[in-house]
Amino acid sequence: MAIKKMWGGRFQEGSSKLVDEFGASISFDKHMAYEDLEGSLAHVKMLKHTNILSADDADKIIAGLHILQDKLANGELTFSTELEDIHMNIESLLTQEIGDVAGKLHTARSRNDQVATDLHLYLKNRLEIVIDEIKNLQKVIVKKAEENVETVMPGYTHLQHAQPISYGHYLMAYYQMFQRDIERFEFNKKHTNISPLGAAALAGTTFPIDREFTAKELDFDNIYANSLDAVSDRDFVLEFLSNASILMMHLSRFCEEIILWCSYEFGYIELSDKYSTGSSIMPQKKNPDMAELIRGKSGRVYGHLTALLATMKSLPLAYNKDLQEDKEGVFDAVKTVIPSLKIFAGMLDTLTVNKDKMLHATEHDFSNATELADYLATKGIPFRKAHAIVGQLVFEGIENNTTLSDIPLEKYKEINSEIGEDIYQFLQSKVAVQRRHSLGGTGFDQVKLQIKNAKKQLNL
């Protein structure tokens, strides 16, 4: 026998099983059960505080909600598809515990402001976790950077050797990206930490509710100023998905370089066995599957952002059933982002840096060409002319399989008689890196300064 719908008073026929299954959201919004109970507790306490409900009725409801909280914590609650969503399921379970007085809980409240409140609470809590995990990753980056301040490697543009840099400097570039991610999520908290509770269906309520009371109970910083906006706003969700997409993009870029650099052709790093997998047919394989998975999962989060933008783009005010589609993407994004951060931090912390291979790559290429052009410019040669001269020398080196350091001093003196033996020191990769002392540059002192500032930021 079908369960009678709590909203079924004006209907003469029951809905079909297919409609029930298609419209039900309990399969995923059960993830907000904790938040739904928290919101209901705040609401009933407010109803008691304002004398909308008697103390006796309110206390019975509060006691029943606490029982459900305990059962939820112990995994003892069972939800029904026929009851549609988490709100109806909780009310039904509460009725089983305390009887018909449970029906008074929904006084001065709609599922519209109820679900909005649940989602705000859910995301508010997860934002803190995401920010903490980013900071944990930053700590690993700082540790690894400190170990590799003087590790010299090729810097790339267009994936071609450009100029030698410090590997620590490279790592600190990602530290800055993740710091911007933190700042975006912190701003996201401002728009998430607002209470929609009390907006009711869309127009507020005739009951003398106290929205400030419930906001304080739920530790919200602010209250929606407009009831229509309160129940229809999903900007805070879009902000989260946008921020999560940018964060995953940063992780994906980092993963791409890890995947390249642990290959035989590069050999700059080696991943720990703990974060690698093998092949079912090729015994020699050690695959960077975790890095590849994180790179792949970035597209998953992008998809959730695009889907919700498409859902929201034509919705008239206020609530529409389309908004049921706002949750699965958020839940999945949370379940994607947090493990990705944890796994990446562990992968980075345990990888081995092949310092000799990195340095060797800078000593048998032409990434010191800019150093030579700068050196010639200090001898009075206009930089554009120096650039052309060095370009010709590079071409000749490629033709003859020699480097700029192989060119004899006599050849250099033909370019400018003031060139001395010191030119060969300037062409050394480590010297080239050391000399870049401009603020934010790759010079060792500058990298140490970046690390010092990061430690201060992280309270290390």
UniProtKB/Swiss-Prot annotation:
PROSITE patterns: FUMARATE_LYASES. Its EC number is 4.3.2.1. The keyword NAD does not apply. GO terms for molecular function: argininosuccinate lyase activity. GO terms for biological process: arginine biosynthetic process via ornithine; L-arginine biosynthetic process. It comes from the Bacteria. The keyword Cell membrane does not apply. It is found in: Cytoplasm. InterPro entries: Arg_succ_lyase_C, Argininosuccinate_lyase, Fumarase/histidase_N, Fumarate_lyase_CS, Fumarate_lyase_fam, Fumarate_lyase_N, L-Aspartase-like. Keywords: Amino-acid biosynthesis, Arginine biosynthesis, Cytoplasm, Lyase. GO terms for cellular component: cytosol. It catalyses: 2-(N(omega)-L-arginino)succinate = fumarate + L-arginine. Pathway: Amino-acid biosynthesis; L-arginine biosynthesis; L-arginine from L-ornithine and carbamoyl phosphate: step 3/3. HAMAP family: Arg_succ_lyase. Belongs to the lyase 1 family. Argininosuccinate lyase subfamily. This is Argininosuccinate lyase. It comes from Ligilactobacillus salivarius (strain UCC118).
